Amino acid sequence: MNVILAGKDNAKYLKNNTEVNTPYKKIFQDFIDIEIPNHGNFEGYPNRNSMQYIDLYNLKDVRSLKRGTLRHKGFCKAWNAIINSGLTKTSKNNTEYNRNLTYFDFFNQNIKAKSKEDLKKILDEKYDIKSDSIEYKNLEWSGLFSDKKVNGSLFESNNEILLDILKDKWTTDKNDIDLIVMYHSIIYEINKKERKIISYLNIEGDDNIYTAMSKTVGLPIAILIEEI
């Protein structure tokens, strides 16, 4: 559910001494390309409120500060289409309208394409998603163009229906492994000379039990407990 709600909150960050406020409908348009050695390129988008870290880390003289999230290539444009189609809304739906909806009907409820071929044209014109692009393939793979039925009467909001659709594909099988990557870019001055430090972290899971997420969350706590 966290990734669905990530498209619900606005984002704030500092850029050249100016506070930038990105509304949630534009968050996934505001992404940059970031290369992680040995793992390729990722898309980075602003994540919620970066301004809170200025006081937390005593960075009162900092001119730019942005905290973000990295996703695989092709994620941001696809998720931007999902958000701006109203699929992450938490407001209550009309139960009768949603009864026996197909996955395609659900995705298309606000796009209002006349057919799946018409949808390809609209996605291209409105969201810059070509029918042969990785973004289109991501949407298709997730099941959003399927004729499978979802009983909308079981859910109260679009985000609940979306979660029910995505959970079939967005799970790890026995032999799947997850990946966590981190990227820090720090630009600073010493003796009026600008310098830059870039650091990377990448951790792979072993399987769908001993995941990269469990390592990064569990190991620091385990080390702390041992030290105490």
What residues fall within each predicted segment?
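C-terminal catalytic/substrate-binding lobe primarily of soluble NAD(P)-dependent oxidoreductases
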Residues: 1-228
